[in-house]
């Protein structure tokens, strides 16, 4: 007979991810996601202005920091999604960070 999968809440905590080092809560993740648009726009503003070493250095620093933030947002959403792929909230988080990533790479394709 097939075993029925347990709900995440039924699992021993030692077998559950602690994602709080990345984001304290889903609400904290949402706030970081909302702030991402302004950061993408600020990095996209470098388009056509990479003509000297100082500006290029600033651009590289800004894109490196932005990529770190996107990676953290993505990892959190992906792991929340992987906890239970049936959950609509996690599916939404995963879809939205993927959409933001597309926005980022589009903005940086100059």
Predicted regions and their residues:
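N-terminal helix-rich structural modules
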Residues: 1-110
């Amino acid at each position: 007979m097939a075993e029925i999968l347990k709900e995440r809440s039924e699992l021993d905590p030692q077998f559950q991810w602690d994602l709080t080092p990345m984001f304290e809560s889903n609400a904290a993740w949402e706030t970081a996601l909302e702030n991402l648009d302004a950061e993408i726009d600020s990095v996209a503003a470098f388009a056509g202005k990479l003509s000297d070493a100082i500006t290029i250095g600033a651009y590289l620093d800004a894109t490196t920091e932005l990529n770190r933030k996107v990676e953290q947002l993505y990892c959190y959403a992906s792991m929340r999604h992987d906890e239970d792929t049936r959950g609509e909230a996690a599916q939404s988080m995963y879809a939205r960070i993927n959409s933001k990533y597309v926005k980022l790479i589009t903005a940086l394709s100059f």
